[in-house]
């Protein structure tokens, strides 16, 4: 049972509704839902928040393009998002919209408080601005920098997304970020689990705090779609304050009705994508410090759900619509895949092949067949009746009982750390062990010997109880399947579906099983893989006809022997961090994970890739080159790339190959 304070407040980012949501957005929200359901199962009083970030220049421009008002645009978009959450059976307790009055009135108060405290001041700002990112950048932060004949910067791209930036000069209010830098570092030290995974914390400290925090622009005057600054209404409160404070405004903070704030704040965990870690672990805690408010207990930054060819985009024809998958395959199938396939703190790759395999092997074969066989045997041998637990009869019984009890402990540990894929993998070990138990005990042989009836009855009980425990553990992840399992096992007593009922083996008693429909019909793999690929390609714009390329003459190098080639050590390396090298427009500093060790490599690809495009990619690295220093940075190898028409492309590799694999 939970501790004395049994509340649990969990949030997702609020989504920016400038385009249709894809499976990557569903990933975050389903993960948050699984955690919320798990905590409810454990007896916690849970508050799960999600919502939409509805202000900003991009929204205003989108509305103008459609000849509608920004409010009409966001009303439609928010309705679509809420419809998707309903289809995913997200159990959120609230949906906050930043255009709601309850949000705007508090934002006005917060801004005024920060102004009165001297944390915000008015000045003029000139900087490079990316509209899609709604972010200002300094010259040193830009990538793909363009210069004129005098060497002056005349353009570049966002280091976060690769979008072009434009030089903007305007009056702005600024937040004194540097004032709180030391206090923030101290908080990191005193709260080592505040930022998870650990690698994200190191990135924040080394890349942003140690180099020095610059004051942050927190208002805009070049558009008017947003919350106005009360004493200076030509200014609109910028996204950093407007969006981040949703976690408080949804609880009624600084209003007469602040019961929810008093009950649930500080948040137990903010779930965010890794691209917005900085805003949640630097800007957000500093603003809370300025208001003398408690900080959230944890920010968990998960990775991206990628495709084989990188991030999802319509231009690549690799966008996956979650609704398409739900309608054809079912909701539980999608939810299971999302949380089983990818370690939550890392990037993962969606493949149609992997999706279909998870359904056929894990769900249909392992789980579905186990339930079908168990119910059929209990019906056949004991007219569907399950009695009470008599204890283990054989060593096989003892082993299965032990595995079940250890599974519950390991599952609980994984869930507390938000290791969803580990929790499901642990549960599937119990399911696999239960399948093996059938082969070990051979009930069909026991049934032929009347003297073995007690042993046979014990086998049937252990099968049913293992399935009941599995159904309880599935409840955070799957919304329909656990109830179908309880129904087929004849379980109507709600106490047998609760967490407390699985801490010790043997709680099931006096039920009658009933045959039901198969949980997961098996799919025709090739047909379904082709279907999903077709839907993905359908997301791409029509391609123009291309002329067939003529063969080109190339300069050939002298031939080498196989022994000479084998002297070059090529290995699969995953990019875990990437950043520009200071005062070097062409260089990126990459942190590579080789599986057996981590290395730093400096590569001359900064004009062709943003850091974010590389993080999560598996590349080919030459690992036995002598280390060198480039612009003062140690480089312990080289990544392979090819050049065509002046454009460099890194050599990527099948994402399923393990890190460190030798390439021959």
From Swiss-Prot:
Compartmental location: Cytoplasm
Predominant localisation class: cytoplasm
GO biological process: methionyl-tRNA aminoacylation
Sequence ranges assigned to domain tRNA-binding in this UniProt record: 570-662
Signal peptide: none
Region (Disordered): 536-556
Catalytic activity, EC: 6.1.1.10
Residues annotated as binding ATP: 314
Protein's organism: Bacillus subtilis (strain 168)
Assembly mode: Homodimer.
GO cellular component, one term: cytoplasm
'HIGH' region (motif): residue ranges: 15-25
Protein name, per record: Methionine--tRNA ligase
GO molecular function: ATP binding; methionine-tRNA ligase activity; tRNA binding
Reactions mediated catalytically: tRNA(Met) + L-methionine + ATP = L-methionyl-tRNA(Met) + AMP + diphosphate
This protein's record includes keyword Cell membrane: no
The family this protein is said to belong to: Belongs to the class-I aminoacyl-tRNA synthetase family. MetG type 2B subfamily.
Motif ('KMSKS' region): 311-315
Function: Is required not only for elongation of protein synthesis but also for the initiation of all mRNA translation through initiator tRNA(fMet) aminoacylation.
Keyword hit for Aminoacyl-tRNA synthetase: yes
Gene that this polypeptide is encoded by: metG
UniProt keyword terms in alphabetical order: Aminoacyl-tRNA synthetase, ATP-binding, Cytoplasm, Ligase, Nucleotide-binding, Protein biosynthesis, RNA-binding, tRNA-binding
Domain of life of the source: Bacteria
NCBIfam families: metG, metG_C_term, PRK12267.1
């Amino acid at each position: 049972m939970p501790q004395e304070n049994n509340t649990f407040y969990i949030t997702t980012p609020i989504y920016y509704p400038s385009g249709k949501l894809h499976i990557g957005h569903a990933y975050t929200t389903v993960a948050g839902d699984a955690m919320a359901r798990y905590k409810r199962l454990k007896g916690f009083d849970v508050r799960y928040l999600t919502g939409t970030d509805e202000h900003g220049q991009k929204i205003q421009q989108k509305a103008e393009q459609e000849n509608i008002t920004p409010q009409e645009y966001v009303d439609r978009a928010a309705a679509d998002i809420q419809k998707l959450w309903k289809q995913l059976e997200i159990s959120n307790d609230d949906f906050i919209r930043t255009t709601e009055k309850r949000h705007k009135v508090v934002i006005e108060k917060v801004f005024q408080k920060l102004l009165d405290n001297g944390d915000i001041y008015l000045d003029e700002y000139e900087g490079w601005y990316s509209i899609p990112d709604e972010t200002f950048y300094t010259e040193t932060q830009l990538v793909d920098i363009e210069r004129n004949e005098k060497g002056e910067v005349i353009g570049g791209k966002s280091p976060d997304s690769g979008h072009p930036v434009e030089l903007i000069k305007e009056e702005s209010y600024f937040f004194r970020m540097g004032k709180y830098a030391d206090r923030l570092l101290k908080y990191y030290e005193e709260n080592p689990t505040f930022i998870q995974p650990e690698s994200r914390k190191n990135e924040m400290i080394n890349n942003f705090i140690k180099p020095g925090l610059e004051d942050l622009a927190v208002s805009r005057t070049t558009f008017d779609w947003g919350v106005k600054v009360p004493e200076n209404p030509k200014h609109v409160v910028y996204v950093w304050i407007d969006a981040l404070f949703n976690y408080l405004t949804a609880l009624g903070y600084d209003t007469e009705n602040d019961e929810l704030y008093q009950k649930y704040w500080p948040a137990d965990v903010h779930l965010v994508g890794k691209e917005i870690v900085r805003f949640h672990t630097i800007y957000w805690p500093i603003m809370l410090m300025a208001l003398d408010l408690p900080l959230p207990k944890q920010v968990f930054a998960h990775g991206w759900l990628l495709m084989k060819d990188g991030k999802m985009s319509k231009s690549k024809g690799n966008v996956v619509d979650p609704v398409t998958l739900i309608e054809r395959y079912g909701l539980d199938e999608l939810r299971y895949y999302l949380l089983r396939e990818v370690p939550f703190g890392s990037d993962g790759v969606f493949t149609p092949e992997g999706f279909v395999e998870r359904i056929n092997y894990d769900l249909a074969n392992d789980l579905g067949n186990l339930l079908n066989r168990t119910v059929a045997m209990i019906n056949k041998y004991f007219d569907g009746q399950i009695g009470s637990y008599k204890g283990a009869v054989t060593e096989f019984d003892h082993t299965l009982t032990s595995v079940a009890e250890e599974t519950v402990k390991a599952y609980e540990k994984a869930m507390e750390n938000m290791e969803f894929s580990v929790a499901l993998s642990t549960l599937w070990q119990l399911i696999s062990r239960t399948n093996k138990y059938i082969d070990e005990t051979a009930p069909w042989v026991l049934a032929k010997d009347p003297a073995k009836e007690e042993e046979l009855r014990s086998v049937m009980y252990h099968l049913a109880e293992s399935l009941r425990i599995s159904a309880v553990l599935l409840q955070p992840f799957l919304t329909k399947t656990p109830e179908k399992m309880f129904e087929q096992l004849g379980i109507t007593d709600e106490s047998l579906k609760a967490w407390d009922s699985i801490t010790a083996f043997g709680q099931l008693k006096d039920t009658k099983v009933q045959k039901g429909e198969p949980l997961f019909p098996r799919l025709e793999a090739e047909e379904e893989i082709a279907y999903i690929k077709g839907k993905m390609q359908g997301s791409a714009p029509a391609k123009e006809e291309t002329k067939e390329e003529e063969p080109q003459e190339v300069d050939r190098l002298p031939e080498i022997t196989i022994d000479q080639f084998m002297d070059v050590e090529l290995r699969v390396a995953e990019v875990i961090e990437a950043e520009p090298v200071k005062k070097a427009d062409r260089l990126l500093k990459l942190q590579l994970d080789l599986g057996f060790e981590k290395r730093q490599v400096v590569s001359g690809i900064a004009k062709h890739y943003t850091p974010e495009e590389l993080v999560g990619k598996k590349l080919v690295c030459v690992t036995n080159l002598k280390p060198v220093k480039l612009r003062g940075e140690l480089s312990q190898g080289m990544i392979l790339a090819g050049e065509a028409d002046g454009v460099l492309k890194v050599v990527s590799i099948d994402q399923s190959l393990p890190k460190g694999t030798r390439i021959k």
